[in-house]
């Protein structure tokens, strides 16, 4: 973790994120029908490109997640704020975009892929995506339009590239690995 010990986001790195109990997905975010007005245009295009490949539940969950991420961006992550409140100096807390390589292993759910990539795109980070399987044409086009570099790489090729990245000691580069839900689920 790169958070400052005792800092505002420190505890986030010490825990884990788990899904909440099943909710009524039909009623999720009924007030957000116009995603184009709520989401960054690039994120909205990613959602539009993938939603036809999702069932109703996954489509609703992804929509809910993208709206929640947009609200969190606007309220906390997308703006600098002085959390100290000192009158004689400014101590701005800012979240800065960091380059990220996202690896979607074979069987990665498309909603999971879009959620992670959309967060990076919204944050203004340089996002590079490595996928084991070819993406649907609409999604590949939306990713390209959002400025995401996409490479289709076999597992061995990805492993070699990851080893090269690790040995290069590229400062500030993050790697996010996604896989099939049944392999990554927390029990």
Residue ranges of predicted features:
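C-terminal segments
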Residues: 1-187
């Amino acid at each position: 973790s790169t958070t400052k010990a005792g800092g505002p986001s420190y505890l986030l790195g010490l825990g884990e994120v788990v899904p909440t109990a099943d909710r009524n997905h039909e009623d999720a975010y009924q007030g957000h029908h116009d995603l184009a007005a709520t989401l960054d245009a690039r994120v909205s295009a990613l959602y539009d490109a993938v939603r036809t490949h999702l069932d109703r539940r996954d489509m609703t969950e992804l929509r809910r997640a993208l709206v929640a991420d947009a609200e969190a961006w606007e309220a906390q992550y997308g703006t600098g704020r002085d959390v100290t409140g000192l009158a004689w100096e400014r101590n701005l807390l800012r979240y800065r975009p960091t380059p990220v390589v996202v690896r979607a292993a074979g069987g990665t759910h498309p909603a999971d892929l879009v959620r992670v990539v959309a967060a990076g795109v919204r944050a203004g980070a340089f996002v590079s995506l490595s996928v084991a399987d070819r993406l649907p044409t609409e999604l590949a086009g939306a990713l390209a339009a959002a400025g995401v570099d996409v490479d289709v790489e076999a597992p061995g090729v990805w492993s070699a590239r990851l080893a090269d990245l690790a040995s290069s000691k590229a400062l500030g580069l993050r790697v996010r690995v996604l896989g099939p839900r049944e392999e990554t689920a927390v029990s």
